[in-house]
Amino acid sequence: MSNVNRRNLLVAAGASSLVAACGGGGGGGGYSGGGGGSSSSSSSSSSSSSSVTLPDPSTAPALKNHFAANFKIGMAVDPGIASEAIANAILLKHVNSITAESVMKANPIGVSEGVYDFSQADTLVAFAQANSIEIRGHALNWYQTSPAWFFAGDQTDMTAYKALVRGRLETYVTDVVNHFKGKVYAWDVVNEVTSDDGSATYRNSQWYQIFGPDFIDYAFNAAHAADPTVSLFINEYGTEEAGKRGRFLTILDGMIARGVPVSGVGHQMHINTGFPAASDVDAALTAVEARGLINHITEMDVSLYNDPGSCYSGTGCLPEATGATLATALHAQALKYREPYAVYVAHASVKSVTTWGVADNHTWLDSFPVVRKNHPLLFDEAGNPKSAFWAIVDPTFVVP
């Protein structure tokens, strides 16, 4: 998401200016059930982000097995990262779903009208298939990665222009879905269509300016026609924030009323150590369930930095966490990870949970909203399970 969009959302949500600090003990939601894995065997794990004593990494349960009764476990990755030693070992042990972080978006695939480059996406699919990992497709329509050729043309006659652009969208969606037919179990069809501004419902993207909400219908209908068996999702960030969730549900209700073939909602869940509360996550999932749809968590990470809203316009950002501040932030992060995972397990409608990355050595949050080291994932820079990992797999684990 763009800096300004993220900033506006967090301002609306009342983001704090401090890294959240949590008291001792396990805290948080926890859950019972799920797969195996014991935390009884402990050793001093070497970690690039922490020096606390954690269970022996060799005792870590495979996440895909631990949560097998609940949902798929996924991670976002591109081919270059998937082949690196740290990421490769984690992926092969822990996941049964991967999302293409960038190589299935329209700007790398849609070279020009009718000309496609599937090479990188095909490489990722081949890796997944060779290792019995399923693929989530991401994303067929996103305003930030729509090539300019979609919108080229004479706008003097808007009826003809709209027909031209609609045809390009439908052809692109059809061709891409057909290319990956039988290889992708779910598609994020449209991504981030909800306004962050409370005075509007829809994001004022170029797609919306041309078509209003109709472009959503065109994309979904084309995807469903190309592959009636694949699950189709609308993907959004900020569904855990009440105001934006209300606007998003207005969009979703309109889609349902119009008969758009939507299977479920992708909740990005880019959160931080101070926001949201478990009740906010529960409200988002419950609202989707009430509409008869399924839930996927599509891009989860937990930033160490509970920045003020002004940080997203470049001022007031917290300094890079080191030493005792880092230890405090990692403690808070583990407790924050535990809370939503307990909520996910409590909702049978949650069918897939994906983190936006594999380990802390590669994360978009190292450069967003400013350049500083972040540690937002379940595995540290060396690929070892962090406190956050143990917090979600063991409800008795006392977060150090």
Predicted ranges, named:
Residues 1-17:
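N-terminal secretory signal peptides and thylakoid transit peptides that target proteins
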Residues 97-111, 120-232, 237-239, 307:
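Substrate-binding cleft and catalytic face of glycoside hydrolase catalytic domains
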